[in-house]
């Protein structure tokens, strides 16, 4: 009699699975074909084709068996090994009617696990965390699935030895197999590489894997939350459903839906609750060979509605657990789920997940694993915390989440001797809820004396639990997803305060061998209990040595010391930690005293206390929904004397970023001069106590300490706020240092607007014109300092600079500098490096050899500006803006200062000096929010290469001799409105112009290039943008006399660029300027005579100055002749 083996056929998610029967007589043929075609199947089942297995029924029973054993596709991470499909498998139970994928269920109904080869090709992993997806696929009658069922394996492989060899083909290297399965499991769920936390050789190794190195929080104002919810279509639905009680009074407006569970007092939120039937204890037996629990009276997680005790959850409207007894068990596909998540949650509340990996080399007993995620604030008050002022440090908690991990709620278990995917256990009964980290209200914030109390709190919670877990050798993976509210503060670092996020883990490791020795009777009748031994991750791994030294701590130590050298409190601790010796097991030999409140333990228990920091980053607002990050443009006129234009690229500036800025000043009166242009960043930091009753400014420690050597330097300043100079252009190096200094050397009377002068009554009168500065401002980032560096830094508010030497210049060893300037950090003026600017077409650009951006100085007449550059590095950078935390406020302003001198119009002729100040608020964000991280690449970056030579244009490729000139070439790097000349001079023929205007002017200028002598030479090299820019001066002159009011002699005189080469340039104003055909630009040469007859005798074929092109365009025969 032939027995039948049920095979579940995958179908659509909205339909029931269809069950077919295959006779056991065909089993041998099926398995033989399965083994022969394994390689072909692994390469042919793509994700697109694999979806067909779950979409339609296969007509062949062979294909049914193939899909049931191998799965319905390949893993997205690997298509070569069969075990790579492990992390995408959908584990089923004994009930084949409820199966989603193809499986060979065991015929033993009493087993709580069975063998399966199911694979789910499309996990629908959107922005919803994967744990909720796994909850939807959870079998409600059991949560564990053991793949290595000996009964089922015997049924499959009893008639064919090929299957036995196929299942055990990884037996040669089980370690590589385990590592590969673990890495694929984590990679499939979006985790990055593992980071080790703790290592005790031959016993236990703990590591962590996170979904991201940093968590990015959106910048969303309270009034924009409703707007975003409105455009996402979830505002009306959110308003109709009130939100349950939360643990914060300052939380965001959290939208909900009719079936969404609300927050309880533990910040426990389940976005996808399942109304499932309570399963019977008979169907929830544990796998004894996978794990064991010493506490026999602990309830099974499956019997508690698939939730653990620490993560217990009560849904709104379902407070009585007996209400769901009569509801039918359902398991829907995520796409067919009736409860949809509002889009506002996905866009405004970022998700974050982390996985804890425990690797055991032997069977070990552990206590419950306590995990906490805390957000802590530390503020050091320089004069004591009011009102008592007994303590200097204020510490409190603004948010926390906690979990309890044990042997029942793991996600994945890989035994130590795992050789195939059939040996791996994945727990689906783990219904760990998704929690939301929010900011606590002022009344619910818990204060603590110092940062050591946080360690004591988690140890007290650990000691309160007496449960133990017997864990077999292997790898245990616990995954924990969380959601962060958008209004919580990001990680902040300031001179007197910190806002940090840390993940803490605590457990007790019990050594069985030591317990047996300790249980024997001792010779002494008096036994003294040993102190508790605690191990931190900093004992073995250098990355976790977090230095939370605050500059205020060092300041208070120096203030309280009376004539003695004050060492920071953390210095002795670090020295004491370095003197500890570690044995071969990585344990410290020093048994320090236990903290207060900790229970006394025997030496057979080792307490593990680990800490992992998290970095939260605030991103700029999205440009698609708000205009907060728009560019800045200022165009104003000061006192009808000076017009200035300022453009800045953006308002949200990443630290260590370079943002372009353009400043243009134009004089409106001739008695005005600009001496200096300075760009600075003003910073203001203020702190408030936890109850908002007391506050102080970051500059108060310096202002209230007359013994500080920088106190007088601070008092003489006009503005007390900190101002970090970023850029400066001046004619003399008389002011303080800046990060980038441009000193102009060829000005007239130290006026940045005048570079030429004219003679009037035997007196040089400067000729003022508009002046434009184009550069990139660099905003330096702060440096995290320890106790040693904090003592060497100047106090906040005093900025010192270190000069950056030019490697191309020889080092100057002159010691003629000022001693006082050396002591306060001023650079030596005698050792300044002068950058000589060559007189070429790029004379207005400075190539910085130190990697900084170029600076362009231009005038309206294109006069060559000679200047040199000095670079300095500040010892203290700028800090982040704080906009989402009222207790710590930090703001910045970009300030542009114009130093202006103006002569009175009266008879006194008194020169008065002014400072025109223009400031605008900016926001400094993290350096991780640079353009390469938050912006998409441009089309040019994706399609072109920087080193690739561009092909010629159509006109350049098809042009012949005597044809019209080619159009201006387009380069993305040289976009400017000045390059787009709309005149017809570029398309007029040379012959036609020479017939109208036989007299041409030969221009000889080094900056504008040589004149065109032959049209054949011009056609040999196509006209480029740089060539076209050099001829704009002549073309502008061609249309400057269209009305015929100016004299024709203007075109027979020298050009301004030629006269600018001389040492003395004068202008004669004795003639009448209103004479017909007279040009005001008649220059007088006092050094040598310039003969204009040479230009009249030379017949040039190039285009001359165009006065009027005529009423009609030229004909083709005129052009080609």
UniProtKB/Swiss-Prot annotation:
Annotated stretches, region: Disordered: 273-342, 513-532, 579-600, 837-860, 999-1022, 1075-1121
GO term, biological process aspect, one: regulation of transcription by RNA polymerase II
Here the segments flagged for biased composition (Polar residues) are 276-310, 847-860, 999-1009
Gene Ontology, cellular component aspect? cytoplasm; cytosol; nucleus
Report biased composition (Low complexity) as residue ranges.
318-329, 519-529, 582-597, 1084-1093
Q: How does it get modified after it is made?
A: Phosphorylated by CDC28.
Q: Which residues carry this modification: Phosphoserine?
A: 23, 46, 127, 327, 987
The question of whether Ubl conjugation is a record keyword is answered with yes
Its localization reads: Cytoplasm; Nucleus
Q: What induces it?
A: Repressed by glucose and increased expression upon nitrogen depletion.
Keywords in alphabetical order: Cytoplasm, Isopeptide bond, Nucleus, Phosphoprotein, Repressor, Transcription, Transcription regulation, Ubl conjugation
Q: Where exactly is the Glycyl lysine isopeptide (Lys-Gly) (interchain with G-Cter in ubiquitin) cross-link placed along the chain?
A: 841
Q: Which InterPro entries match?
A: Arrestin-like_C, Arrestin_C-like, Arrestin_domain-protein
Q: Where is the composition biased (Basic and acidic residues)?
A: 837-846
Principal location listed in the UniProt entry: cytoplasm
What Gene3D superfamilies does this protein's entry cite? Answer: 2.60.40.640
GO MF entries = protein-macromolecule adaptor activity; ubiquitin protein ligase binding
Task: State the function annotated in the UniProt record.
Answer: Transcription factor involved in the regulation of fermentation and aerobic oxidation. Acts as a repressor of CYC1, which is involved in electron flow through the mitochondria under aerobic condition. Required for pseudohyphal formation upon nitrogen starvation. May be involved in viability at stationary phase and aging.
Q: Which family does it belong to?
A: Belongs to the CSR2 family.
Listed name of the protein:
Transcription factor CSR2
User: Which taxonomic lineage does the organism of this UniProt entry have?
Assistant: Eukaryota, Fungi, Dikarya, Ascomycota, Saccharomycotina
